[in-house]
Swiss-Prot record:
Domain of life assignment: Eukaryota
Family to which the UniProt record says this protein belongs: Belongs to the protamine P1 family.
Organism from which the protein derives: Planigale maculata sinualis
Protein name: Sperm protamine P1
GO biological process: cell differentiation; chromosome condensation; spermatogenesis
GO cellular component: nucleosome; nucleus
Subcellular location: Nucleus; Chromosome
Expression across tissues: Testis.
Alphabetically ordered keywords of this record: Chromosome, Developmental protein, Differentiation, DNA condensation, DNA-binding, Nucleosome core, Nucleus, Spermatogenesis
Amino acid sequence: MARCRRHSRSRSRSRNQCQRRRRRRYNRRRTYRRSRRHSRRRRGRRRGCSRRRYSRRGRRRY
C-alpha cells in the first residue's frame, strides 16, 4: 500500500492525503497480512495503483 501511495502522489495531492487519513483506521498488522497475500498478483502489474482501478465490489470492471 505504501508503494501504491507513492505512485498516486504525482497525480493528485488531495486524494493522497485522504488515503493516508483512511489508512490509520485499519490495524497495521491486518493491512500487512493482506498485502502479503495479494503481493503475487500485484507484482505482475506495472502501472500505478491497483486500488484505483478496481473497486472493492467489482474486480473485473476494467
